[in-house]
Amino acid sequence: MRIPRFYFPDALTLGARVALPKDAAHHAVRVLRMGEGDAVSLFNGDNHAYSARILRIEKQNIVVLIESRVALSCESTLSILLVQGISSGERMDYTLQKAVELGVAAIQPIQAERSVVKLAGERREKRMQHWQNVVTAACEQCGRNKVPEVKPVSGLMDWLGEQGSEGQRILLVPDAEMRLRELAQPVGAVTLAVGPEGGFSDKEQTALLHYGFTSVRLGPRVLRTETAALAALASMQALWGDY
């Protein structure tokens, strides 16, 4: 039986007794029906896996004992920042979840001109927390011990103005002349920009190209935004990463 994995947001030390976060405790008790003495695995983003055992269960509170620690990194040799135009509802969640499984290092949500979902104020903060929870849950499932950051939502021009010039920069465009596999092996990190439903506007594409992005296509077919991002990530891992 696969040992359940849970994210723990604070430092962990051998021999420590810690209470699982509320959501993790609820899942362990109500969904997995775990009991005292059962084994769990914890991670907190430091590229280690911590083996623990349940000491006691009190209603929704679970206390575990940290028994061992092992260095375990599942991070790709290729560092990819996904710059994703915000798509609607489940599409964005799906993109983030699968991007984590495909080894993305971080995600930058962009409030693009054609984004159907418009976020501001408290709604934006809640959505960002939701996205970070999606990413954390994906790490629990896929075995990553380092949690990719979901960066604060930004407009495209604001984000571009804050960036340097280092690394390979790739923009997915359905009618681009160059194909992804025709690009040279990147030196250092890669930034991948993918538009929302309908893609980036002409103005946004022009700005991205001005800031050093190279437009590429993925085959002769038009892909949905969630398909495009994931197909590109998988292709880059196969070409330059750990596939």
What role is predicted for each listed range?
Residues 163-205, 213-216:
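Active-site/ligand-binding-proximal alpha/beta "capping" segment
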Residues 40, 64, 147-151, 215:
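Generic structural signal for residues in well-ordered beta-strands
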Residues 73-170:
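RNA substrate-binding interface of SAM-dependent RNA methyltransferases
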